[in-house]
Amino acid sequence: MATRTTAIVIDAGSSGSRAHLYTFGAPQLTTIREEWSMKRWPGLSACALKEPKAPSIEANISGCARKNLSHMLHDLEAGCRTKSVHCVGAPVYLRATAGLRLLQPQDRESILQGAAEAIRQSSFRLTSLPRTLPGSEEALYDWLMVNAAAGTLGAPRSATFAVLDMGGGSTQIAFEPASASPSFQGMQQLSSQMGGRALYAVSRLGFGMNEAHDSVLARWRGAGRHPCKLPGDYEGCRKEVSAFVRAAEEEGATGLGRQPRTPPLPPGMQVVGLDNFYFAVLALWGGDASRAPTDAAMPAGLADAVGRLPPAPTLPEMEARARRLCAFSEDALKLDLGGHTRDKKLKAEKLPKACTCAALIVVLAREVYGVTDEQRIAVAADIHGFDGSWALGAMVYEIAEGTGQNGLVGVGVIIVRPIVRPIIVAGALLLVGLAVSGLRRAGWGWPLSNVRLYSVL
């Protein structure tokens, strides 16, 4: 069996940290396979927020982060031994998102220092210092993840996917618009190595499910019960969420300046929703995503590891279910979900925010992103066995960056899809194939700032 190279991407999010372990094979071509992923709660930001579940609360912030991450790295090492995957010396790329963006700079730096120390003390290799992802980079990785897993990185614009992602602290959108006008803040020009596409890729801080829910409740000045609290009222909740979103956009509170303009989605472009988009659909359809509407004409590239197409409801279909969901008490919602609460995306702590989440998705999609009521949004927990996370996009990006550093020319990325045969992405548009020896020469450690595969227009 050919030797495979191992690399780990850790998504240090606001609610928890998820590690993705990838392997690559073949001496001439890079093959990408996600061996497994694992999540640990709470997130690293809990060390600065002094949340009760954070380890070593009595210690300093850096020590808390080191202990938090050390537990995850220990579990990864054990998993590598159990699954007979060679992980000693594997590079670890830790990238933090909105949870750390929301912290004070000194707290953020302390957490990243503690994370770096944990990696150095493990059997893995620290070749790229932990850092906080700018929101635009997270959005770019979302786009790369979906289109790499679906096999459309080298496709014409009309065949690529627009990607919406909602975490706990922020929300992202990324797609290739029909016009690459610099007047739209957030336009990024990919390098020729990545096909030279002009993408719109932005993040809005504070529009993640957890942050938005807390903000919407804090703004309440009405009498009686807040309509977003279960049992609540969907129409009232949507109005409150809409007012919050409009105010944040007008005040420039999301990090994009005041009243940022969004380019229109190209007609016919398929939209994919990740993370809490999937959670919302699970909650809306009784914990079983297969009950939600889908579209038989949807591209097969979006199928999961066993070939099932994802649910793809329209906004009106979501709203019809949201009116029912928001009227539930928390106990009634749990009964409605029944045994389906075993789904890893249906965490108990999310359920009180389900009404807000559904309203937020509708408001953002309709009022900010311009999604029409006829457009279906395919919501995916995984695509061909790859977890629905920006981590795969980051891995593809790192590979392409290594190509730029070494001047290597490849013939494309082969995405190895468990149970599904590999698909070769057109090398003329995505020259990121690498010899494994080239990866070793690169050391897998070039910081992203050294080689930009995109530029801001």
Question: Would you name each region that the model predicts?
Answer:
Residues 24:
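Hydrophobic pocket-lining residues within nucleotide cofactor-binding pockets
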Residues 7, 21, 43-85, 93, ...:
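Helical "lid/coupling" subdomains associated with nucleotide-phosphate turnover
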Residues 166:
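Calcium-coordinating acidic loop motifs
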Residues 2-10, 14:
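N-terminal module-boundary/linker segments of secreted carbohydrate-active enzymes
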Residues 27-35, 126, 182:
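Beta-strand initiation motifs
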Residues 31-39, 88-92:
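Short coil-to-beta-strand
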Residues 15, 169:
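Conserved Rossmann-like nucleotide-cofactor binding loop
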